[in-house]
Amino acid sequence: MPEKHAWTRWFWGVMGACALAQLVLAGATAGYAADYNTFWAWALRVAEEGFSGFYAEGYFADYPPGGILLLWPLGKLAQLLHISHASAFARCLLAAPGILAGMGLAALCYRLAGPGRARGFVLGVAAGASPALLYVTGVWKQMDMVYLLFLVACFAALGKRRLFAAALCWGAALALKPQALILGPVLAVCVLADAWYSPK
Protein backbone atom coordinates (compact mmCIF):
# COMPACT_ATOMS: atom_id res chain seq x y z
CA MET A 1 0.00 0.00 0.00
CA PRO A 2 2.76 2.57 0.78
CA GLU A 3 4.34 1.81 -2.60
CA LYS A 4 1.00 2.41 -4.33
CA HIS A 5 0.61 5.79 -2.66
CA ALA A 6 4.19 6.67 -3.59
CA TRP A 7 3.56 6.03 -7.29
CA THR A 8 0.39 8.12 -7.11
CA ARG A 9 2.19 11.01 -5.44
CA TRP A 10 4.98 10.89 -8.00
CA PHE A 11 2.46 10.77 -10.82
CA TRP A 12 0.55 13.84 -9.69
CA GLY A 13 3.79 15.64 -8.88
CA VAL A 14 5.00 15.15 -12.45
CA MET A 15 1.61 16.14 -13.86
CA GLY A 16 1.56 19.28 -11.73
CA ALA A 17 5.02 20.20 -13.02
CA CYS A 18 3.88 19.59 -16.61
CA ALA A 19 0.82 21.79 -16.12
CA LEU A 20 2.97 24.56 -14.65
CA ALA A 21 5.45 24.27 -17.53
CA GLN A 22 2.62 24.55 -20.04
CA LEU A 23 1.24 27.65 -18.31
CA VAL A 24 4.69 29.26 -18.43
CA LEU A 25 5.04 28.35 -22.11
CA ALA A 26 1.53 29.63 -22.83
CA GLY A 27 2.19 32.98 -21.22
CA ALA A 28 5.61 33.42 -22.79
CA THR A 29 4.78 32.47 -26.40
CA ALA A 30 2.48 34.08 -28.93
CA GLY A 31 1.04 30.83 -30.24
CA TYR A 32 -0.06 30.02 -33.76
CA ALA A 33 -1.28 33.48 -34.75
CA ALA A 34 -4.01 32.51 -37.21
CA ASP A 35 -5.72 30.07 -34.84
CA TYR A 36 -5.07 32.14 -31.73
CA ASN A 37 -6.74 35.26 -33.12
CA THR A 38 -9.60 33.21 -34.58
CA PHE A 39 -10.26 31.41 -31.30
CA TRP A 40 -10.42 34.66 -29.39
CA ALA A 41 -12.66 36.24 -32.03
CA TRP A 42 -15.03 33.28 -31.67
CA ALA A 43 -14.85 33.37 -27.87
CA LEU A 44 -15.80 37.05 -27.74
CA ARG A 45 -18.48 36.65 -30.40
CA VAL A 46 -20.26 33.77 -28.67
CA ALA A 47 -20.01 35.61 -25.35
CA GLU A 48 -21.68 38.65 -26.91
CA GLU A 49 -24.13 37.09 -29.38
CA GLY A 50 -24.93 33.83 -27.62
CA PHE A 51 -25.12 30.47 -29.34
CA SER A 52 -28.24 31.36 -31.30
CA GLY A 53 -26.51 34.29 -32.98
CA PHE A 54 -23.06 32.82 -33.37
CA TYR A 55 -23.46 30.85 -36.60
CA ALA A 56 -24.76 33.76 -38.66
CA GLU A 57 -24.86 33.67 -42.44
CA GLY A 58 -21.60 34.95 -43.89
CA TYR A 59 -19.64 34.56 -40.64
CA PHE A 60 -16.68 32.19 -40.83
CA ALA A 61 -16.81 29.50 -38.14
CA ASP A 62 -15.71 25.99 -39.09
CA TYR A 63 -15.79 24.49 -35.59
CA PRO A 64 -18.76 22.42 -34.35
CA PRO A 65 -20.79 23.67 -31.35
CA GLY A 66 -18.73 21.67 -28.84
CA GLY A 67 -15.59 23.63 -29.66
CA ILE A 68 -17.46 26.92 -29.40
CA LEU A 69 -18.91 25.81 -26.06
CA LEU A 70 -15.37 25.52 -24.70
CA LEU A 71 -14.62 29.07 -25.84
CA TRP A 72 -17.79 30.61 -24.40
CA PRO A 73 -16.66 30.83 -20.73
CA LEU A 74 -13.30 32.21 -21.86
CA GLY A 75 -15.05 34.98 -23.78
CA LYS A 76 -17.33 35.73 -20.83
CA LEU A 77 -14.37 35.94 -18.46
CA ALA A 78 -12.47 38.18 -20.88
CA GLN A 79 -15.47 40.51 -21.07
CA LEU A 80 -15.98 40.54 -17.31
CA LEU A 81 -12.34 41.26 -16.47
CA HIS A 82 -11.62 43.37 -19.58
CA ILE A 83 -8.77 41.08 -20.62
CA SER A 84 -6.88 41.93 -23.78
CA HIS A 85 -6.50 38.92 -26.04
CA ALA A 86 -2.87 39.97 -26.59
CA SER A 87 -1.99 39.65 -22.89
CA ALA A 88 -0.07 36.80 -21.27
CA PHE A 89 -3.10 36.07 -19.09
CA ALA A 90 -5.27 35.64 -22.19
CA ARG A 91 -2.73 33.24 -23.66
CA CYS A 92 -2.76 31.17 -20.46
CA LEU A 93 -6.55 31.29 -20.40
CA LEU A 94 -6.85 29.91 -23.92
CA ALA A 95 -4.41 27.10 -23.10
CA ALA A 96 -6.22 26.16 -19.86
CA PRO A 97 -8.84 23.75 -21.34
CA GLY A 98 -6.12 21.81 -23.15
CA ILE A 99 -3.93 21.70 -20.05
CA LEU A 100 -6.77 20.38 -17.87
CA ALA A 101 -7.73 17.84 -20.53
CA GLY A 102 -4.11 16.73 -20.77
CA MET A 103 -4.09 16.02 -17.05
CA GLY A 104 -7.37 14.15 -17.44
CA LEU A 105 -5.92 12.08 -20.28
CA ALA A 106 -2.84 11.24 -18.23
CA ALA A 107 -5.01 10.25 -15.26
CA LEU A 108 -7.15 8.03 -17.49
CA CYS A 109 -4.08 6.27 -18.90
CA TYR A 110 -2.67 5.91 -15.38
CA ARG A 111 -5.87 4.26 -14.22
CA LEU A 112 -6.19 2.00 -17.26
CA ALA A 113 -2.64 0.69 -16.87
CA GLY A 114 -3.02 0.10 -13.14
CA PRO A 115 -2.95 2.96 -10.61
CA GLY A 116 -0.24 2.72 -8.00
CA ARG A 117 2.02 0.64 -10.25
CA ALA A 118 5.13 1.46 -12.24
CA ARG A 119 3.45 0.70 -15.57
CA GLY A 120 0.58 3.06 -14.74
CA PHE A 121 3.05 5.79 -13.87
CA VAL A 122 5.02 5.28 -17.08
CA LEU A 123 1.96 5.24 -19.34
CA GLY A 124 0.32 8.19 -17.60
CA VAL A 125 3.45 10.32 -17.76
CA ALA A 126 4.10 9.29 -21.37
CA ALA A 127 0.60 10.51 -22.27
CA GLY A 128 0.54 13.67 -20.18
CA ALA A 129 4.14 14.76 -20.70
CA SER A 130 4.53 13.99 -24.40
CA PRO A 131 6.65 16.81 -25.90
CA ALA A 132 4.42 16.97 -28.98
CA LEU A 133 1.27 17.37 -26.90
CA LEU A 134 2.93 19.86 -24.56
CA TYR A 135 3.93 21.94 -27.58
CA VAL A 136 0.48 21.81 -29.15
CA THR A 137 -1.16 22.92 -25.90
CA GLY A 138 1.42 25.18 -24.28
CA VAL A 139 2.86 26.90 -27.34
CA TRP A 140 0.13 26.70 -29.97
CA LYS A 141 -2.78 26.99 -27.47
CA GLN A 142 -4.79 24.31 -29.28
CA MET A 143 -7.59 22.33 -27.61
CA ASP A 144 -6.81 19.01 -29.26
CA MET A 145 -6.21 17.42 -25.86
CA VAL A 146 -9.91 17.79 -25.03
CA TYR A 147 -10.81 15.98 -28.24
CA LEU A 148 -8.15 13.32 -27.61
CA LEU A 149 -9.37 12.74 -24.05
CA PHE A 150 -12.85 11.85 -25.29
CA LEU A 151 -11.46 9.56 -28.00
CA VAL A 152 -9.29 7.62 -25.55
CA ALA A 153 -12.22 7.41 -23.14
CA CYS A 154 -14.33 6.05 -26.02
CA PHE A 155 -11.87 3.23 -26.71
CA ALA A 156 -11.47 2.52 -23.00
CA ALA A 157 -15.23 2.09 -22.74
CA LEU A 158 -15.27 -0.12 -25.84
CA GLY A 159 -12.63 -2.32 -24.25
CA LYS A 160 -14.98 -2.90 -21.33
CA ARG A 161 -18.00 -3.35 -23.64
CA ARG A 162 -19.67 -0.25 -22.25
CA LEU A 163 -21.15 0.71 -25.57
CA PHE A 164 -23.44 3.50 -24.42
CA ALA A 165 -20.59 5.25 -22.59
CA ALA A 166 -18.38 4.77 -25.66
CA ALA A 167 -21.05 6.32 -27.88
CA LEU A 168 -21.39 9.31 -25.55
CA CYS A 169 -17.63 9.89 -25.56
CA TRP A 170 -17.49 9.58 -29.33
CA GLY A 171 -20.39 12.02 -29.66
CA ALA A 172 -18.57 14.51 -27.42
CA ALA A 173 -15.43 14.17 -29.56
CA LEU A 174 -17.50 14.68 -32.70
CA ALA A 175 -19.06 17.81 -31.20
CA LEU A 176 -15.54 19.17 -30.76
CA LYS A 177 -13.94 18.19 -34.08
CA PRO A 178 -15.51 16.55 -37.14
CA GLN A 179 -12.42 14.36 -37.56
CA ALA A 180 -14.02 11.99 -35.05
CA LEU A 181 -16.19 10.79 -37.94
CA ILE A 182 -13.22 8.70 -39.07
CA LEU A 183 -13.70 6.47 -36.02
CA GLY A 184 -17.45 6.11 -36.51
CA PRO A 185 -17.11 2.83 -38.46
CA VAL A 186 -14.95 1.37 -35.68
CA LEU A 187 -17.66 2.14 -33.13
CA ALA A 188 -20.33 0.70 -35.43
CA VAL A 189 -18.38 -2.55 -35.91
CA CYS A 190 -17.94 -2.91 -32.14
CA VAL A 191 -21.66 -2.42 -31.56
CA LEU A 192 -22.59 -4.95 -34.25
CA ALA A 193 -20.02 -7.45 -32.98
CA ASP A 194 -21.33 -7.12 -29.45
CA ALA A 195 -24.89 -7.69 -30.63
CA TRP A 196 -23.82 -10.67 -32.75
CA TYR A 197 -21.73 -12.43 -30.11
CA SER A 198 -23.83 -11.62 -27.05
CA PRO A 199 -25.47 -14.68 -25.48
CA LYS A 200 -29.01 -15.12 -26.76
Give the positions of each predicted feature.
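Start-transfer (signal-anchor) and selected internal transmembrane alpha helices
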Residues: M1-V24, R111-L123
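Short helix- or helix-capping micro-motifs
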Residues: C18, L123-P131, W170, L174
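Extracytosolic helix-loop segments that constitute the early lumenal/periplasmic catalytic or substrate-binding loops
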Residues: D35-D62, G66, K76-I83
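Short acidic/glycine- and proline-prone juxtamembrane loop motifs at membrane-interface regions
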Residues: G138-V146
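Transmembrane-helix motifs of polytopic, lipid-linked glycan transferases
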Residues: C92-G116
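Specific aromatic-rich, kink-prone transmembrane helix
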Residues: L108, V146-L163
